[in-house]
A protein has these predicted regions:
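A generic structural micro-feature
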Residues: 2-4, 30, 77-83, 103-106
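Conserved N-terminal beta-strand and adjoining loop/helix that marks the start
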Residues: 1-18, 88
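Short loop segments at secondary-structure junctions
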Residues: 14-17, 24, 90-95, 114-116
């Protein structure tokens, strides 16, 4: 049986910098773009808005589609194939992004200059590809 794991991520760009997160998933430290897993019955943009609200206490607006996985990537955690969808997003308010308290996998936020973004700084192969696309675009 084929099993797919759909992930949705946001590229929040401000002042020529993109937001990335450092997270603890299981016992692994992960560096990635903000976002997460699509839940059953949820659209991709709804998923991304939920993830930003839950993990970053931030409301966002979808600007445009940026990239969808176009190569095979097995999950690092289970026996599924990862399909990741990336959107460029913007905040809907001027409130500073703060990490919510409690059971939050996000441990740190960082703004990385687009011209200095390094694909090797990311954990997952799809994020590395997106970092390369961002770097080449700027």
């Amino acid at each position: 049986m084929l099993r797919f794991n759909v992930r949705v991520y946001g590229l929040l760009i401000h002042d020529e910098k993109v937001l990335i997160t450092d997270e603890l998933i299981g016992n692994k430290n992960i560096t990635k773009f903000p976002g997460g897993g699509l839940e059953y019955g949820e659209g991709t943009t709804d998923c991304l808005q939920r993830e930003f609200a839950e993990e970053l206490a931030t409301e966002i607006e979808i600007v445009n589609h940026f990239y969808t996985t176009d190569f095979f990537v097995p999950s690092a955690f289970d026996n599924t194939q990862i399909i990741s969808i990336y959107y460029q997003v913007k905040k809907t308010s001027n409130k500073e992004i703060k990490l919510p308290h409690g059971d939050n996998p996000v441990k740190n936020l960082r703004w990385i200059e687009l011209k200095k973004i390094n694909p090797d700084d990311f954990t997952f192969p799809i994020d590395k590809k997106v970092a390369e696309l961002l770097r080449n675009k700027n």
